[in-house]
């Protein structure tokens, strides 16, 4: 029955063109990890889902496993066995890192342990979050801003100078995105909180996302418990490789 459920997840019935060609609904399944009671949540269904993914080798529903320092070795081995087939059928979260990041950001521990991913892989607290992001490419910043499109009019005395310039350009790009995000707000209320610009009503989401009713605000006007806007960096691996190559070939 569960295998048939996964197969149904691959059936697309659409009335128009789709902007994305990656063939996923973004309805994610999260396995294992620390439960709200503080205990490991791995169970028989965890392994059953992994068996299905291995046998069917399909991408829907996207499945991620939460791993931590106390993850059973049996589960670690099983996850590796499924991943080796490729296709990105199973992703993993380093749960210890994610929980530390969330609590450092201000989430209560009891909320942080409930984390799941949204449509892609960004973590959030399900049922309580309005999440959005602005994507940007770190490699483009290195190429176009720091190295000025390789125009020959840029020079650095050391790799540290180059890296400092890149870090400054990266920070500048984030500040520009922050300015864009500020456009979502009409200003501050008397109590100092931000007031969102008026948005079209979204009754269904507002009914199901926690605290929209309590706050008397639409989901798109700040009604959810957590309203998150984030810079979404891409090209990290290419950027790191490029910086390393420059350091080795030019400065070392």
Regions found by a protein language model. Give the residues of each.
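Conserved catalytic cores of very large enzyme subunits
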Residues: 1-252
């Amino acid at each position: 029955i569960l295998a048939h459920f996964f197969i149904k997840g691959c059936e697309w019935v659409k009335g128009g063109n789709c902007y994305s060609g990656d063939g996923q609904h973004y309805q994610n399944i999260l396995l294992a990890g620390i439960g709200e009671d503080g205990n490991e949540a791995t169970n028989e269904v965890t392994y059953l889902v992994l068996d299905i993914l291995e046998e069917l080798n399909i991408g829907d529903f996207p499945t991620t496993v939460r791993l931590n320092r106390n993850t059973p070795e049996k589960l670690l081995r099983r996850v590796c066995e499924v991943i080796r087939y490729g296709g990105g059928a199973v992703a993993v979260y380093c749960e210890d890192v994610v929980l530390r990041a969330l609590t450092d950001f201000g989430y209560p521990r009891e909320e942080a342990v409930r984390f799941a991913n949204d449509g892609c892989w960004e973590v959030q607290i399900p049922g309580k979050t309005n999440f959005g992001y602005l994507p940007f490419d770190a490699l483009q910043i290195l190429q176009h801003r720091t190295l000025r499109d390789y125009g020959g009019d840029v020079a650095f005395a050391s790799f540290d100078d180059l890296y400092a310039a890149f870090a400054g350009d990266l920070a500048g790009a984030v500040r520009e995105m922050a300015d864009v995000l500020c456009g979502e707000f009409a200003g501050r209320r008397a109590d100092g909180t931000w007031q969102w610009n008026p948005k079209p009503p979204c009754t269904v989401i507002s009914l199901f996302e926690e605290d929209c009713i309590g706050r008397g605000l639409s989901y798109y006007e700040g009604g959810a418990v957590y309203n998150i806007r984030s810079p979404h960096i891409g090209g990290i691996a290419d950027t790191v490789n490029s910086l390393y190559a420059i350091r080795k070939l030019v400065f070392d």
